[in-house]
Regions:
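Short beta-strand segments
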Residues: 46, 133-139, 185-187, 224-226
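Conserved radical SAM core fold
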Residues: 52, 73-75, 96-98, 140-155, ...
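Glycine-rich tight-turn/loop motif centered on a GG-T
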Residues: 10-18, 104-109, 148-160, 194-198, ...
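Gly/Ser/Thr-enriched, mixed-charge loops and adjacent short helices
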Residues: 174-194, 198
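A charged N-terminal "starter" segment
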Residues: 1-132, 171, 175-180, 207, ...
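Short acidic, glycine/serine/threonine-rich loops at helix termini
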Residues: 56, 79, 99-104, 121-124, ...
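C-terminal active-site-proximal or functional interface alpha/beta core segments in diverse enzymes
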Residues: 190-280
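Histidine/acidic-residue-rich, glycine-tolerant segments that coordinate divalent metal ions
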Residues: 149, 153-180
Length: 280
């Protein structure tokens, strides 16, 4: 973070510019990587949080996957060192061209936001002789207790498939010969500081996972709990690194993960926001 000594060193540089505290950035990424290993979880970095090449190259070097929400993000992440088999393509606005490019690149999976999108990916995979891994984003209808513009898990939000669509979803997946159902994805919002919200997410996810694996008979390899962990904008110098330990521990405590499944997270703002400042 900027201090008086650093500000003096930057004197004379034309503004505006972004300043990155690379020491804090590396400490944050290393801390998350260490916790991920301890808790036996997988982390994908949400590329939309910051696409600066030097940051992405370091994150990829630590074994993170990449969560992308545009075709250009997919290509950029791959160019910055993320292996194709660690890239997940999410987002509500995938074009046919972007889907084609991702198929040809051989990405790990498409994270689908609607039944219509699943139809399109299956048809394109069939056309080009590919088999695509797909995960499905579920709208759990949970209030994240955050700003209305960054909540994503309520019924009225545009993201994900609602539970009343599950029967159609299962029918599509069973009939789609060019798709391999890979896992479930939940993400209820951003800048969440109330851990009880994540507890509620765990309980809802447990209900859905148990239902799909049990009565519905679907095979799931992972559950992606999303991100959303907030950072301390009020006391950034006292709390430069978010409480990742408490965050991961909440999910480990509140969600009973089946032995044959992996728990994933997609962290974005919480990894990079404290490390960058706009200087004007």
């Amino acid at each position: 973070m900027l201090d008086f000594n650093t500000i003096e060193k930057l004197d004379g540089i034309a503004t505006p510019f972004y300043y990155y505290d690379m020491d804090l950035f590396r400490k944050t990424v290393d801390h998350v990587a260490e916790l991920a290993s301890q808790h036996d979880i997988k982390v994908h970095y949400a590329v939309k949080a910051n696409v600066e090449r030097r940051l992405l190259e370091y994150i990829s070097s630590k074994g993170f996957g990449a969560d992308c929400v545009s075709g250009n993000e997919v290509l950029h992440a791959h160019d910055c060192g993320f292996p194709a088999d660690k890239i997940v393509y999410a987002g509500v606005g995938k074009s046919d061209k972007e889907i084609y490019n991702a198929l040809m690149l051989g990405i790990e999976a498409f994270n689908c936001e609607s039944l219509q999108e699943i139809y399109v990916i299956n048809e394109m995979a069939h056309r080009y002789g590919r088999k695509a891994n797909v995960s499905v984003r579920i709208n759990p209808e949970i209030d994240a207790h955050t700003h209305k513009y960054v909540t994503t898990g309520l019924y009225e939000n545009k993201f994900g498939i609602s539970q009343h669509e599950f029967e159609k979803l299962i029918d599509i997946l069973k009939k789609s010969e060019n798709l391999r159902f890979y896992g479930l994805h939940f993400h209820i919002g951003s800048q969440i500081l109330d851990m009880s919200v994540f507890e509620a997410q765990c309980h809802k996810a447990q209900e859905i996972v148990d239902d799909l694996r049990g009565d519905k008979g679907l095979c799931l390899e992972f559950v992606n709990m999303g991100g959303g962990l907030g950072i301390d904008y009020h006391n950034p110098e006292q709390n430069p690194i978010p409480d990742f330990e408490g965050y991961f521990a909440t999910f480990e405590r509140e969600f009973r993960l089946p032995e044959d499944m992996v728990m994933r997270f997609e962290l974005g703002r919480s990894v990079v926001a404290q490390c960058g400042e706009l200087v004007t």
